[in-house]
């Protein structure tokens, strides 16, 4: 089964804790602090592996975690950084943040590497907190947690040419005739429910990948008839071959069929309407096809479309269609969802204010990424560490901000898991 969507949890490694240590040496009674820093946590890195074709592996394993950094040691020895976790994905994989829907990476080129979750920084050892008035600091900072999130992986087919059209117009038959693919073929709608891929070999030096996109119907852009699942596979094809049942064997008008499919493409993503299209007027061996073809040409050809009369069942006209498609592909650029410059910077948080304060049910709530890191890094059972915390929030302007909001002695302040009464 072709798997094109997966949901996985990724967790970067936590940073190692800084060490609390003091120099010990014979004949030296009072050595200074020499606690080393914790190591950085490992990153979660996605890499494009051209040998992979599906997301099948992610159906069986859904949780991935990089290695934590090691704690610091004595004698100013830093902890070892955690190993990065490499997750291999097939070309064409789109990585999205499940919570925000934001595209984190569009992974196309083989070997492309993107850091999706960054490892936490290692905590500072007590050697960093020595001052003229605090020469033997008895506290250090713990490591910061690594980033964690649920991501959605979507595999958008890396086909050069996509066969589109209503169900049962002959797309699968065309694919089976011009490639070695063996799609399921039957005379009813939605025979194809997963995309089929095949390689079209023109000659020893020229070949391209063709995808049989499952049939679209009116309302596909709203998800009707599995429309969303089918439409997303069209987005990265360079060229579309629009297959039309020119015989009208199912009672539909070929011109109307053509209009409906293009309207669905436009409503789903207007960019798809600009994708070059070749028209394969299929089922020319059926009674009434010649008459319908002339009517179809009069309406569609003036718009600049190239029309190829074909009969997939008898393999007539397909060679001309395929050779023209191969020539057209040479003239077209590759298509991607986001450009490479976007890929170079991914999952970079928008710069936030260091803190914000609001009053909630009489409690002053202080939040912000800097505040969260500070609270996590302080040992409130250690007096020196507590003093460090008090000086830090004063230097950052939190105390002044609280007083400007009218805080009084004895009022409650909450900083994430920390809650305390305010006193000057």
Curated annotation (Swiss-Prot):
HAMAP family: GTPase_Obg (MF_01454). It comes from Acetivibrio thermocellus (strain ATCC 27405 / DSM 1237 / JCM 9322 / NBRC 103400 / NCIMB 10682 / NRRL B-4536 / VPI 7372). This is GTPase Obg. Residues 347-424 form the OCT domain. SUPFAM superfamilies: Obg GTP-binding protein C-terminal domain, Obg GTP-binding protein N-terminal domain, P-loop containing nucleoside triphosphate hydrolases. GO terms for cellular component: cytoplasm. Residues 159-330 form the OBG-type G domain. It is found in: Cytoplasm. GO terms for biological process: ribosome biogenesis. Its main location: cytoplasm. Gene3D superfamilies: GTP-binding protein OBG, C-terminal domain, GTP1/OBG domain, P-loop containing nucleotide triphosphate hydrolases.
């Amino acid at each position: 089964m072709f798997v094109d969507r997966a949901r996985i949890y990724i967790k970067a490694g936590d940073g190692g804790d800084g060490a609390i240590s003091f120099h010990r040496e014979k004949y030296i009674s009072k050595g200074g602090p020499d606690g080393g820093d914790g190591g950085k946590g490992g990153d979660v890195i996605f890499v494009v592996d051209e040998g992979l074709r599906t997301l099948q592996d992610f159906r069986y394993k859904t949780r991935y975690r990089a290695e934590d950094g090691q704690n610091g040691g004595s004698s100013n020895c830093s902890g070892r950084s955690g190993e990065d976790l490499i997750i291999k994905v097939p070309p064409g994989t789109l990585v999205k943040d499940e919570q925000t829907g934001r595209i984190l990476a569009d992974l196309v080129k083989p070997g492309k590497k993107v850091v999706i979750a960054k490892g936490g920084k290692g905590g500072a050892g007590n050697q960093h907190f020595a001052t003229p008035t605090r020469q033997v600091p008895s506290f250090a900072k713990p490591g910061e947690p690594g980033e964690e999130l649920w991501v959605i992986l979507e595999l958008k087919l890396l086909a050069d040419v996509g066969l589109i059209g209503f169900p049962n117009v002959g797309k699968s038959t065309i694919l089976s005739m011009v490639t070695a693919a063996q799609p399921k073929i039957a005379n009813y709608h939605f025979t194809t429910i997963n995309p089929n891929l095949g390689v079209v070999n023109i000659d020893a030096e020229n070949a391209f990948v063709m995808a049989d996109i499952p049939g679209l119907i009116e309302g596909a852009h709203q998800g009707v008839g599995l429309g969303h699942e089918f439409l997303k596979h069209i987005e990265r094809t360079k060229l579309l071959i629009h297959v039309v049942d020119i015989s009208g064997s199912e009672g539909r008008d070929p011109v109307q069929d053509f209009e409906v499919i293009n309207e669905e493409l436009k409503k789903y993503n207007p960019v798809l309407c600009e994708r070059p299209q070749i028209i394969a007027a299929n089922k020319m061996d059926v009674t009434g096809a010649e008459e319908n073809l002339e009517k179809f040409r009069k309406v569609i050809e003036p718009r600049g479309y190239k029309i190829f009369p074909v009969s997939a069942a008898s393999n007539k006209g397909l060679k001309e269609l395929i050779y023209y498609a191969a020539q057209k592909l040479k003239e077209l650029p590759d298509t991607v969802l986001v450009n490479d410059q976007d890929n170079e910077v991914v999952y970079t948080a928008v710069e936030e204010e260091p803190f914000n304060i609001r009053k909630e049910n009489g409690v002053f709530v202080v939040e912000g990424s800097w505040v969260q890191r500070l609270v996590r890094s302080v040992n409130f059972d250690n007096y020196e560490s507590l003093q460090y915390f008090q000086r830090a929030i004063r230097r950052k302007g939190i105390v002044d901000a609280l007083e400007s909001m009218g805080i009084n002695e004895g009022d409650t302040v909450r900083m994430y898991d920390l809650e305390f009464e305010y006193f000057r």
